[in-house]
Amino acid sequence: MKLVIAEKPSVAMALASVIGARTRKDGYVEGNGYLVSWCVGHLVGLCDASEYDEKYKKWRYEDLPIVPECWKHRVLEGTKKQFGILKKLMRDSKVDEVICATDAGREGELIFRLVYEQAGCKKPMKRLWISSMEEQAIKDGFASLKDGSCYDSLYQSALCRAKADWLVGINASRLFSVLYNQNLKVGRVQTPTLAMIVDRNQKIKEFTKEKYYMAHIKFDEMDAVTEHFQKKEDADRVAADCMERMCEVEKDDVKEKTVRPPKLYDLTTLQREANRMFGYTAQQTLDAVQEMYEQKLVTYPRTDSQYLTDEMGESTETLIQMLLGKMPYAEGLEYQPDVSKVLNSKKVSDHHAIIPTMEVAKADIGKLKERNRKILYLISARVLTATAAPYIYESHKCQITCNYHTFYLSAKKTKQEGFKTIEKKLKQFFGIIAEKEEPELDIWAGKHYGPCDSFVSEHFTQPPKQYTEDTLLSAMERAGNEELTEDTEKKGLGTPATRAAIIEKLIQSGFVKREKKNLVPTDDGNVLITVLPDEIKSPKMTAEWEMALNHIAQNTETADEFLNGITELMQELVARYQGISEEKKEQFQGKAKGEVIGKCPRCGADVREGKVNFSCSDRNCAFTLWKNDKFLASQGKKMDKTTAKKFLSKGKIHYKDLVSRKTGRQYEATVEMVDPGEGNVQFNLIFPQR
């Protein structure tokens, strides 16, 4: 028999239904010569420092750097049952082959391989690599399985990423926490991302507004302006000279310009667009598109390609015809698609661009969640715009003279709407007001206009804008390679698959907060970046590391070279920072400590309230209760101060008004806090005996 291991139960069930495994067992499905089981995300992870040596339970400078000679892994808390099921299935004598069917990417490869290794499995391994959950795509994937060894370099890249995160997180966090006597959390990718947000915020704070004035003349719905004046009286004089006067277009620099259609979406460009249009966070967009991928409505989401493979031309034409009839904003739209614009196998690595599948044709789109529906409309519209004609217009840069004063006017004249027609229809459908563009005007050199109205406007120079998720994702993608072109080798902070989680972690850790659409550093975030060295917070260096991980996946760089470089950096930091000046330590003095709300059940130290959690004050202890706890939220409750105090004092709380996730009805139960002694706190439901 063949054992198929997916990344999550829902994917496993979808695969099982296609390959004929339909008999449900405990933790797997059986049938037609297959056993189909699943992980639940990561089941196995790297051991904590204290699992290498008990002395590492205490954070001490003299123990640094901590660099394992032989890396150890362990089964993660809360996943032991499913790991046990997989281990038993792998060792079953009936199983002669194991098929890795986790997500077709770096992290999916790691999830499976760590389970395979931890279980001590030596059986032949195959890899299922698909970009769609459609039935035919699954059948084709199982018909063309590759040997697992073909993905060894991808596994090494994933393993290096995990080890690098461990080395930087463990050593840098301990080093600077000990030096400053504060619990400072440092992350390999998280910290440089925070540094960009802090740097932008600092530039805004340091910006000094400067006032300036412009004189205007208005004629025939046209508005021409002067250059900037520092003094209002100078602008007033020009406006007075031109009131009721005639003007002449002295120069008209006309250029025909062509704007090519946008490319198809990769994950980052989709997240950016959804943030611009709907205000969705990167994580919300990823969750929506992942859910629709599992519903077979769109292709694999965690891609960095904006093209399709050359052989997808015919199927793309069929897809477009379906979308024209299915999408409500496409009603009455007529255009000749040119699919050759989106085909380029050389620019597709692991997965092609995100597009809808033909399953959309029979789907009831109206029954989708609102967010999913909007994202599906975006993805579908991008297929249409990407294959549409270019937008062509005449650009007019006019120099206008009025009573010996010079004014300037920019205008345009559209010659071909092209893909803009589809974009306008989509925005009208969503009720989005189009951005202000240059006016469409009939104007040419030598023509006289007037008499003119004139006035003066007051303006201020503008500071840089705070990052939104849209602009931060762009900055993360370009980090270390600001002059990014289509053919440039990509570096960047994180990957399309991880950037959303990085942003969310910064917010959950209390380093960044959302202010409407903006991402703004907190006081803790500002202070952390102030004291860390450039090597740790440099986006460019971290981007170089990300590129090195890509090289490992491509088998052009070795894992040892990469990890040796990280280790040397940690050794250098520990040697350089043996002490901290009193001046720098004072940056942490006087910081308000959160209110003590109880005692830690793990170590007995005080538990204090923070911005996003209630955590143990002993930095050697990781006990934390999160204010946005997902379990309590799923039951209609919050982890507020009163709730946290009750859990710490009694260990459980009895509720009469919990809310069922399935039915929405209220029910009665006791929520018991279960502390495993390490890792995350868990909660159990105890129902009253009837």
For each predicted feature, which ranges?
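Basic, low-complexity terminal or inter-domain segments flanking catalytic cores
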Residues: 2-3, 79, 90, 118, ...
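Intrinsically disordered, low-complexity regulatory segments
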Residues: 1-162, 166, 462-463
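Conserved short loop/turn motifs at secondary-structure junctions
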Residues: 1-3, 101-104, 181-183, 254-263, ...
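Metal- or metallocofactor-binding catalytic centers and their adjacent structured scaffolds
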Residues: 232-265, 271
